[in-house]
């Protein structure tokens, strides 16, 4: 479990921001969202494959030269 110690005379907003940052670094929220509902193994594989294809196309697009505008 993630905990932070609130320092003396520290505003609540600053402590909340530090807490959110630590939660984000641990990846807890993304895991909670992923585990919120059951996902069939086939659906998970399909989602991961689609993400991999999208990453590949994005990488290829950044390597290609832009089209000529004349």
From Swiss-Prot:
It comes from Nitrosospira multiformis (strain ATCC 25196 / NCIMB 11849 / C 71). GO terms for cellular component: ribonucleoprotein complex; ribosome. Disulfide bonds: none annotated. This is Small ribosomal subunit protein bS21. Keywords: Ribonucleoprotein, Ribosomal protein. Belongs to the bacterial ribosomal protein bS21 family. GO terms for molecular function: structural constituent of ribosome. It comes from the Bacteria. InterPro entries: Ribosomal_bS21, Ribosomal_bS21_sf.
